[in-house]
Amino acid sequence: MDIFSEFLNCLSSDGTLNESSIYKTYQILESLNPKDVDTKENYIKLSNTFSTLGSGVGFQDNLLIEMFKILTVLFFKTRSTDLGDLLIESFTSLEIEKLMRVKKTIGSIVLTKGIQELQEIELPKVGFNCMTYDESIFQGISLERLILQLMSIFIAKCEENKLWLVNNRKDLDLRVIGQRLLHRDFACRFLSGLFISRFSVSGDTDESKHQNGIRLQLFIDFSKFETRLTMQILKADRIFSTCVANTVHAYEGLFSSGSNIDSTIATLVLEPRDLIVYRKGFALLQIPWTSVTTIDKIKKVKSLKIITEVSSLDEFVFQCKDGDKFDELFSTSEEIMNKLLPAIIVSPKLTLRNRSIIQIKEGESKLPNTSKQASQNLPHLDDELAYQRFEDQVIDKSVCDDECTNTENTPSSNIPADVKDSLSADDYAYDTKRKTQIEDLEEDQNKSKIASKDGTNLKEINSVPEFSDENVINQTGPAKKTPVQRRKDGKFAKSTKRKKQKSLKPDTENQESSVKNKKAKSNVNLQYSPKTPICKINDETLKPPTIANIAGHKQMNHLTSENIETPVPVPNGNWYNGVKHETATDIFTTCHDGNNSLKSSVWKELLKEKHWKQESKPQLTGNSRQIDLSTFVKQANTPNITSLLDGTCSSPPNNECFNDKEPDSSSSTLISDRQELEYRNPNAETVKLEEIPYNKFFKTVEKNEAYNPSSKSATIDGLQRYTSMIGNQIYEGILQNEKELRSKLEAYHINCNKVIKEFSKRQTARYKIIEKELAQIEVNLVSQIDSLMFK
């Protein structure tokens, strides 16, 4: 122990480390007591040294290799997850040449000790439906993750280590790695499959398949699997899909973070101590539940916004693909968080201490009984997907913290099974605290208002979610819930408002007047209403709503508190300018309504009302939506983008368009009507416009009378249909231009971020080199001054 203490003192005091002292320290490591080594002070000294050891500056190659040997032995000796993380971080930060040199030198030590540790660790005897881990079980799972991850790093692109492991297969039990394919933990299953797949031979020939089968037998006992495994199944994408098939709480959807504008296809897996996000072409994201601070539910787009304390990922949004599983996803995550956090009692006087709260606006949602039996069969998957980027990437190093409390050892574990099922998550986990909390609640219910430090009064709370009165719940009218807000005195308050429903009576007067006045009825038909037939806009170019970079975007049109359950802005994207897809009416309509439409004049109404000069938005009729093209501007990420429709309706139509006559005395605007007439009368070869009475289409104009389009114009059948087609093309052009601008902006931001990151890396490396050189110069100056003083 004295030699090891001297070694640590040299590290902390920047003393000279020679090869002999390092070699002596390495020799006595096996005889040390793990409890004496695994202390906070020793970890601080080691982390300060190995955090700068990754740059490799100031260390020779032989000393660098010996230092990593010492850290490797310390990790397997103490089984400390902190030392394991330090080993992986410092090793992966080395330069490529030094990394490969260290990998080839100490690879045999890492593989030998890793397999020996996996032999001693037993698989947890818990089922796939279990969503709680004992602390000892979780410590073993965390250690297995680190060992498999470290072994996978030393195998990647290193044929020497692969050959050494195969040659020593008789001394090492390689099948302990294949046993992890049946592990309860998702990450262990994924890492074991990734490790085995690195031994595969590329190619589709019979010889390559034969070699893959032989190598697969080294790691897997086929008698424990009902289906035949192949190397192709254990590839990165394929093994992930196989692991998801054996996972109960796995959900597919779209993932987007604050730094990424576009959403990527991802799969979210809920584990008892952490949640895992997998995106094709990226490394796994492992986020411990203890670092999750807030979960907001967006019911409108079936999404969850999760805010974390992880520095690299402050927040992200996951949109569930299957709407039926969204409630299960939300309730499962709520149940897991309730087991990790202390009980929350919602009362008129809220005092919540010591931990952060999940702000959930969807009321009390319980975990549905939708758990399925885990399938032991590995399913046959589709064609193998190309996966190149994942070869050098392994599971993310941000594994679960150890701050989780042991919920299975609570006194409530003695409750019978039938009673547990009837209790909620909070009642089940915190049954022993109810008596004191109910007493405090009875005292607090006598107070109707709470005064904060600044003198402001909170509104009266009419209902309590956990201790509610039936008379309060049965009140008429929907309850408008406000989110949990923090007061200035550091406490929380929650209020509930109720609005009485207004009695809606049918507007019989307007209906009678519209029936009596035929002209008014024709005007009503021109407006937008749910009964008006609409022409569908082509949805092929429109994407579904995506959860993109929503910071800085404007709020959507007609966004109310009823459409969204949490104070989260709805993502902006190519989605009808933020309008709900289910209830959004199209921009253009047609007014084919029998004989009534024939008696009205479209041009008359257009010239009379002059929609192109109106600055205010038109009035809405009922629940319909009306958009004026002259003021319509598509929202976009880039500001100050003018609409392409400005100027298209700047002036009314000229009279010349009505006076241009063809030889058959028909207006040039009625050419499309001829085609419709020919289509409607298939028996006649050609239908001339003179053969049809004029009173069906337009009124007779006297020869000596001047033509006044405002009073006597033709009612054109199908005009709105062609107008809508033109508008649709304009709208699609706007969307296409916006896509191009957005893609250019995204590429520009990505390039800027890359340049900034590379510059910061270069600067930090330069500063480290300068600091080391200054330290050496200082030491030399001090030594020279001492020598001069002695002389």
From Swiss-Prot:
Source species: Schizosaccharomyces pombe (strain 972 / ATCC 24843)
Function: Organizes linear element components on chromosomes and is thus required for meiotic DNA recombination.
Oligomer status and interactors: Component of linear elements (LinEs), which are similar to synaptonemal complexes, at least composed of rec27, rec25, rec10 and mug20. Interacts with rec25; the interaction is direct. Interacts with hop1 (via N-terminus); the interaction is direct. Interacts with rec15 (via C-terminus); the interaction is direct.
Subcellular location: Nucleus; Chromosome
Chief localization: nucleus
Pfam family name, one: Red1
GO BP of this protein: meiotic DNA double-strand break formation; reciprocal meiotic recombination
Protein name as it appears in the record: Linear element protein rec10
Membrane-crossing segments per the record: none
Position of sequence motif Nuclear localization signal: 485-492
Result when mutating residue 434 to H: Decreases meiotic gene conversion at ade6
Record key words, sorted: Chromosome, Meiosis, Nucleus
UniProt cross-references to InterPro entries, sorted A to Z: Red1/Rec10 (IPR012491)
Region (Disordered): 462-523, 644-672
Chain intervals with Polar residues compositional bias: 644-657
Biased composition (Basic residues): 493-503
GO CC annotation: chromatin; linear element; nucleus
Phenotype caused by lack of the gene: Abnormal linear element formation. Abolishes localization of hop1 to meiotic chromosomal axis sites and DNA double-strand break (DSB) hotspots. Severely decreases localization of rec15 to chromosomal axis sites. Abnormal sporulation.
